[in-house]
Amino acid sequence: MAAFSTCAAVIMSQTRISLIVAMDRKRGIGIANQLPWKLPEDLAHFKRTTTGHAIIMGRKTFDSIGRPLPGRHSIVVTRNPDWRHEGTQVAATPEQACALARHEQEAFIIGGAEIFEQTIALADRMIVTEIDAEFDCDTFFPQVDQASWQETGRESLHSAASGLDYAIVTYDRVR
């Protein structure tokens, strides 16, 4: 935990750390390294929100995307010291990833579950797409201490493309 404190101290004054995630009613976020739903409106929201900022992800999340996302500083956390991909920066730990993002206004943690688990203590904000449905998932967003978070925004929406109801909810850390 000391490493997280060090990382937080380095970046807290400069960089807001936000988690951005879409999940179903049971906190499901994926199956077989893919999204279990089609929600193009949320993908557009993700693009609008993260463009121009750093995005931090695990290697499996990067593999599921397949390429660096345009207009974003892509930082990939991996235990494999030989892993490289053009257009990305590589970090061995979430702490190193945070250090690489220290000059950014905002850095978004975009997954997967293990990276969310390792970085939730650093986050200032969570932007959660809460999908009002249940899907077959094998990957889940970690439980959070609700007392540590305050809902500061909610937009309830309906997807014309998929027929799904969902809400984009912003939570800020209680300080």
What are these regions (language model features)?
Residues S13-Q14, I20-R175:
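Flexible, gly/pro- and Lys/Arg-enriched active-site loops
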